[in-house]
């Protein structure tokens, strides 16, 4: 057949099978059945919020690395790819039965602790800075619907806690007066006064009975001494000018088994000036009855009159707020913010009056007459992470615990407060150390976990190393690359880890919701100051996280490589730590932190996955065929036979290669001859037989 005819001939058509059924008919015959479940099949827990958040971050990172536009469709596909990769990993046999317990650091758990006298002063905001000294904020409470939530507490303490109210271990309330002098306009008046009365802290005695004078001076703060004259009223008669000063004598607010608390602020009161008097002069100070109802002197008594044959003097002059501090058993900082909570528990009363001089029985007679027709309601508030626990608070110094049943959680105190209750200052815990259990060993990298699990299943099989090794190498490239993106598994069957995750997640959402700052007033110094306090706690938590090496399957808290040793830290010690009782556990927790930091540092110094890679390398060594040859060829004769067999195979391959080359040359020559013949006009007509033979043989 001529070559041109071969090119023009169409290829044969396929024979159509007449008995082939339509696809729709076959689809109708398909039956879908439920996936078979083994007795060991477990129901997967739904993904947590932290896992979904981590999945979104991983999908975003994967799209950025692949330079794919971030659309909802691409995000969904990337997330599904990560999920399919993670859930397809083989689960080793017996993993569910294994139990690994490690120490975990949980930042900002849903726990509170008492604010102690050793803590720094907290920020207490007032709604009226005209009459009360301090930062102002009239937007509190931030969430009125959450004020007064009921709570039962049982927490521990190491240093004495700060408590206000009529109970052992709490500072007692009392009424305090501040006096200023105004210009006198009446000819019979010696002095004209304006006085402010409000709730304050009750002094036990006016001096430390069991302290010498030299020892009391040891705790005298550095500051401006109080003036020797009564402060003059400012130009603005509606503003009370507060000026911090240090009085000449100290008062003791508490001196018992809970500690000794003193105050160097002035305590102004009227007393008789007996200087230059020849007759007996009562020098006792005139003060309200502290055992009576505290609110009675501020509500019912709107007129005060003091009369005497001796001049009235105002002792401890100065307009300064109380600043209590603890000096025994430890020495702590001053806490001026406590007075702002106390003074807001009832309205303050504004007085005006004068001191007149008359003559009775030919003797000078002095009268102080004060009247009041103005009261000012106040409100004081704290902001998260601080709160106020109000109720029947009981402090037990023997066990160092604080209990309160059916108490209320508040952030603000106003004039409706009932002093039959007590106030305990609390704050959110920065972090706790607890042991958690897992169903696998602690691992720092997800890629090492995936590599170990895949190769563990391969190495447990027989020595089908040729094709298996190729498949494993091809798979490891994709698995390792994807594991760097996945970062964390989406499902975990460890109940304790899930419990801690939910426990900490809810508290984080709670504190974050309470700590939100109004963006419209973010430039105010008070918000900035509170934000700095909150960010300081966050930085402390981040500092711990940077120093720790955490397990790869947790994101909201950190599971450390330190294994929990029950004999060294029994559960009762952990429980006391959760309650905040740090009596005998403080040194243990400090030692535990050092051990955990050392373990994390050791893991950071090593290449991630060094132990796993070493184990995999030992397993892959068994797949080396040279080791098989060594086990088979233990004698020289067998090794020689193997070499001869290899040489024979090599010779056979060479001969086959040469034969294939000859056949290829013959085919090329034949094709060249056919091409020459097809191009000649007239073919072989007119040529001799010899020429034809020569032409064909070319």
UniProtKB/Swiss-Prot annotation:
CDD domains: HIV-1-like_HR1-HR2
Residue ranges annotated as Extracellular topological domain: 89-631
Signal peptide: 1-88
Region (Disordered): 1-25
A Pfam family it matches: GP41
Residues the record marks as carrying a glycan: 99, 127, 152, 273, 354, 371, 460, 506, 553, 565, 584
Subunit structure and binding partners: The surface (SU) and transmembrane (TM) proteins form a heterodimer. SU and TM are attached by noncovalent interactions or by a labile interchain disulfide bond.
Family of this protein: Belongs to the beta type-B retroviral envelope protein family. HERV class-II K(HML-2) env subfamily.
Functional summary from the UniProt entry: Retroviral envelope proteins mediate receptor recognition and membrane fusion during early infection. Endogenous envelope proteins may have kept, lost or modified their original function during evolution. This endogenous envelope protein has lost its original fusogenic properties. SU mediates receptor recognition.
Listed name of the protein: Endogenous retrovirus group K member 21 Env polyprotein
Organism: Homo sapiens
């Amino acid at each position: 057949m001529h070559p041109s005819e071969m090119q023009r001939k169409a290829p044969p058509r396929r024979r159509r099978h007449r008995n082939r059924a339509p696809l729709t008919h076959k689809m109708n015959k398909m039956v879908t059945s439920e996936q078979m479940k083994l007795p060991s099949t477990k129901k997967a827990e739904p993904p947590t919020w932290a896992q979904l958040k981590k999945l979104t971050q991983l999908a975003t990172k994967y799209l950025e690395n692949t330079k794919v536009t971030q659309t909802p469709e691409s995000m969904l596909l990337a997330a599904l790819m990560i999920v399919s990769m993670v859930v397809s990993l083989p689960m080793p046999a017996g993993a569910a039965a294994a139990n690994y317990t490690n120490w975990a650091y949980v930042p900002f758990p849903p726990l509170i602790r008492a604010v102690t006298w050793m803590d720094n002063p907290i920020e207490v905001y007032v709604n009226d800075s005209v009459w009360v000294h301090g930062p102002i904020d009239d937007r509190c409470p931030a969430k009125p619907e959450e004020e007064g939530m009921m709570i039962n507490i049982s927490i521990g303490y190491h240093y004495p806690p700060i408590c206000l109210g009529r109970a052992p271990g709490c500072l007692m309330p009392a009424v305090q007066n501040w006096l200023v002098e105004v210009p006198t306009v009446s000819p019979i008046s010696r002095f004209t006064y304006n006085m402010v009365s409000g709730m304050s802290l009750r002094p036990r005695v006016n001096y430390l009975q069991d302290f010498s004078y030299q020892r009391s001076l040891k705790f005298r703060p550095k500051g401006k001494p109080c003036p020797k004259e009564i402060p003059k009223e400012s130009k603005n008669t509606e503003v009370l000018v507060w000026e911090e000063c240090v009085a000449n004598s100290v008062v003791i607010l508490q001196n018992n088994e809970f500690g000794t608390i003193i105050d160097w602020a002035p305590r102004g009161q009227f007393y008789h000036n007996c200087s230059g008097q020849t007759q007996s002069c009562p020098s006792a100070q005139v003060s309200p009855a502290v055992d009576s109802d505290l609110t009675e002197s501020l509500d019912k008594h709107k007129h005060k009159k003091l009369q005497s044959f001796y001049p009235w003097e105002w002792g401890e002059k100065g307009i300064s707020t109380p600043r209590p501090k603890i000096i025994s058993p430890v020495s702590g900082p001053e806490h001026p913010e406590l007075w702002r909570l106390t003074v807001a528990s009832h309205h303050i009363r504004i007085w005006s009056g004068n001191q007149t001089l008359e003559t009775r029985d030919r003797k000078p007679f002095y009268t102080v007459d004060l009247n009041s027709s103005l009261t000012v309601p106040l409100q004081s508030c704290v902001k998260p992470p601080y709160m106020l626990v109000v109720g029947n608070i009981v402090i037990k110094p023997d066990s160092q615990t604080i209990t309160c049943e059916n108490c209320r959680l508040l952030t603000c105190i106003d004039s409706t407060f009932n002093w039959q209750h007590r106030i305990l200052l609390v704050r959110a815990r920065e972090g706790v150390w607890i042991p958690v259990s897992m169903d696998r060993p602690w691992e720092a990298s997800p890629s090492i976990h995936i590599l170990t699990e895949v190769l563990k299943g391969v190495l447990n099989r027989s020595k089908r190393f040729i094709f298996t090794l190729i498949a494993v190498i091809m798979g490891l490239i994709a698995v390792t690359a994807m594991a760097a993106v996945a970062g964390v598994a989406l499902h975990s069957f460890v109940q304790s880890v899930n419990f801690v995750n939910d426990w900490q997640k809810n508290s984080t959402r709670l504190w974050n919701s309470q700590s939100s700052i109004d963006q419209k007033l973010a430039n105010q110094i008070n918000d900035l100051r509170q934000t700095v306090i909150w960010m300081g706690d966050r930085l402390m938590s981040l500092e711990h996280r940077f120093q720790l090496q955490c397990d790869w399957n947790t994101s909201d808290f950190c599971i450390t490589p330190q294994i929990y040793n029950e004999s060294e830290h029994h559960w009762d010690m952990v429980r006391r730590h959760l309650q905040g009782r740090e009596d005998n556990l403080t040194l243990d927790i400090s030692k535990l932190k050092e051990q955990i930091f050392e373990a994390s540092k050791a893991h950071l110094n090593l290449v991630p996955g060094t132990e796993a890679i070493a184990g995999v390398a030992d397993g892959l060594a068994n797949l080396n065929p040279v080791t098989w040859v060594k086990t088979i060829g233990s004698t020289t004769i067998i090794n020689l036979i193997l070499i001869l067999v290899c040489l024979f195979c090599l010779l056979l391959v060479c001969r086959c290669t040469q034969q294939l080359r000859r056949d290829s040359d013959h085919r090329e020559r034949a094709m060249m001859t056919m091409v020459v013949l097809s191009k000649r006009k007239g073919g072989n007509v007119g040529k001799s037989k010899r020429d034809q033979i020569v032409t064909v043989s070319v």
